């Protein structure tokens, strides 16, 4: 054991809790959407994609981590490490880029930078395809030699190799690519789109002399923006910051928990996403009931 058995027990219990909550909520999202025709709208296709991404993380990542935590190390070998790392990365990236597509959709529909544009089913499918392509450009390279997946932290889950400059894997270039394309860019897009969305609501409220309806709309959008931004940062910023520090300070001494804690903070969107995008949607709530 790299740390005390109690830490592995706590990790296993945490993963069990994520599975216990994340699987039924995301599965329910899929079921309700497929069951109720009125929910099959272009916007909800993106929400459905989030649920699929979260299920990838739950079934492909969380279950494996819970199992390996019972043994105190990653017992599934190189193939198991590649599969766990791939599915966990794929699910997280699909969710991340789905949030970007959703932010762009909200900006275009509400702020109308393109006059007479209507978000259609074809646009939604293009957005979904984009999210999958971007996710695969992050999750596949470590399987084919551009970087690699290795056990990290407490050695119960696998992630991209930020830790070494292993010869032949070009870890440095892949990590730099990840930290340019797969973190600041999506974060900047989300901030820009929701910032413009909030400004548009404020302008509409001012033009209508702060009517009760527009005040309520401004409040709802403000709350959604705050939740989105905080949720994104809380989940991803600790992991990205620690991973970048490790990459820049390879060879430095740090304990296994140093990387374990932020990596499992980043797994919480499997619970956050349905809460933010589904439970705050009245139509979804009514259909679930």
UniProtKB/Swiss-Prot annotation:
The keyword ATP-binding belongs to this UniProt entry's keyword annotation: no
Example of a GO biological process term: visual perception
Keywords attached to this entry: Cell projection, Chromophore, Disulfide bond, G-protein coupled receptor, Glycoprotein, Lipoprotein, Membrane, Palmitate, Phosphoprotein, Photoreceptor protein, Receptor, Retinal protein, Sensory transduction, Transducer, Transmembrane, Transmembrane helix, Vision
Topological region Extracellular: 1-7, 68-81, 145-173, 246-257
Places the protein is found: Membrane; Cell projection, Cilium, Photoreceptor outer segment
Gene Ontology terms: cellular component: membrane; photoreceptor disc membrane; plasma membrane
Pfam family, one: 7tm_1
Membrane topology value: Multi-pass membrane protein
UniProt short sequence motif 'Ionic lock' involved in activated form stabilization, positions renumbered to this chain: 105-107
Domain of life of the native organism: Eukaryota
InterPro entries on file: GPCR_opsins, GPCR_Rhodpsn, GPCR_Rhodpsn_7TM, Opsin, Retinal_BS, Rhodopsin
Modified residues (N6-(retinylidene)lysine): 267
Disulfide bonds: 81-158
Membrane-crossing segments per the record: 8-32, 45-67, 82-104, 124-144, 174-195, 224-245, 258-279
Glycosylated residues (UniProt): 171
Primary location group: membrane
Molecular-function GO terms, alphabetical: 11-cis retinal binding; G protein-coupled photoreceptor activity
Cytoplasmic side: 33-44, 105-123, 196-223, 280-289
PROSITE patterns noted in UniProt: G_PROTEIN_RECEP_F1_1 (PS00237), G_PROTEIN_RECEP_F1_2 (PS50262), OPSIN (PS00238)
Record bears the keyword tRNA processing: no
Site positions (Plays an important role in the conformation switch to the active conformation): 84
Record PTM: Phosphorylated on some or all of the serine and threonine residues present in the C-terminal region.
Protein family membership: Belongs to the G-protein coupled receptor 1 family. Opsin subfamily.
Function recorded in the entry: Photoreceptor required for image-forming vision at low light intensity. While most salt water fish species use retinal as chromophore, most freshwater fish use 3-dehydroretinal, or a mixture of retinal and 3-dehydroretinal. Light-induced isomerization of 11-cis to all-trans retinal triggers a conformational change that activates signaling via G-proteins. Subsequent receptor phosphorylation mediates displacement of the bound G-protein alpha subunit by arrestin and terminates signaling.
Designated name of the protein: Rhodopsin
Source organism (scientific name): Batrachocottus multiradiatus (Baikal sculpin)
